[in-house]
């Protein structure tokens, strides 16, 4: 519940028994996520989503030993809904709460088992390229809890650049997947943009976004 998706999963001994996601189509008309609408949708969705996750897992809520929740980063209103629900659920069942950094969860989600026979385990240390809607980072992962950001965007995240470019082209939200699909069908050598020179492991997408907007403006004039 960090942004516009309400999600719940049931995990036993590292094996995922269920995973339910409810996406919010209400933001499409606005070309981006509206925080207030996202918060309201989370309030409507969170109980049905959690109930469905328990149902698919074949687990009763009384059997739960703990409840994990997203503490951030994310939209404040969305985070408050998830946190408040987790606190109430924890108190009612008398079970502990586990707060989770959702970016760390992105890194470690690849190692959640889907069956008892899945023995895939992380080989620490390793490097992770984390690219999500609002974040773009290079992370050195030393252990489950020890992670070090060694590089990141100094301006826009890759997802933000995708969505902003998609919006000016009149593509529906979210535009990233649509641009990705169209790019695979197009000519990769049709246009060339200058690549920013950033020291170290950091990177920048704002210049690339601006170059694209100028190109689009000039093409429209023609």
Give the predicted meaning of each segment.
Residues 60-63, 85-102, 109-111:
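Nucleotide and nucleotide-moiety/phosphate-recognizing core
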Residues 70, 81, 97-105, 130-131, ...:
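Active-site nucleophile and cofactor-binding loops and adjacent substrate-binding regions
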Residues 69-93, 112-113:
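Short Gly/Thr/Asp-enriched flexible loops that form oxyanion-binding sites at enzyme active sites
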Residues 66-68, 78, 121, 126-130:
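Short glycine-aspartate micro-motif
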